[in-house]
Amino acid sequence: MSLAALALTLTLAAPTQVDAGARAAYAGLLKTYVKDGRVDYAGLAQKDLPKLDGYLAAVAKASLPKERDARMAFYIDAYNAIVLKSVIAHGRPRSVLDVKGFFDADEYTVAGEKTTLDALEKKHLNPFAKDPRTHFALVCGAVGCPILDGVPYTGANLEARLDAATRRYLTSPTGARAQAGSVELSKIFDWYAGDFGGAAGVLTFVRRHLPEAQAKALGDSPKVGFIDYNWTLNQQ
């Protein structure tokens, strides 16, 4: 093989960014099959599964964006798309917890590397991002999770979207139930307390993102409890 031919072969085989067509197809799926955060898994499976598969194929061979916000957006969209695919692949279970290995055994390829959902979140996204707001952008397929947006993430809109997702979750009965002197929080704040800086960091984070009146009503040392997590599938 000539050097020119070898160079061409390596170029064609090298990972590339997720192409615009695949991203547009994924955006179309979200717009069509997500309403108020709930997913029409049956409709997606029956009508447009090849488009989801096409997007995940593009994710599998993509290179990781170098820019921080773009890489975070890539990981978030990949995670959420994999959840959609995995729910459908397992026959739309009543709960993702009914599927053994849903998070820690089922493997998908992201940017050329085999990974599970747990590994994608805990070994790739979280250590790279060091931003606890990502917990409110990742959608695990359960009612207790943050809701799935009908629009993909991008590097350009990441900051605003993470803030919006965090505030939306904390002002929902699933995320936080605040009153004078006490607050009940999603178990996310218990499971991932370390990402928020421990118990004190959790309260600082919650105060920062709650509406001002609710944050003030908590007082200096509010009683903190945790809401039972609803693992029912987030389907329409």
Where are these regions (language model features)?
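Hydrophobic helical h-region of N-terminal Sec-dependent signal peptides
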Residues: 4-12
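Interaction/scaffold regions that mediate signaling and macromolecular assembly across diverse proteins
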Residues: 16-236
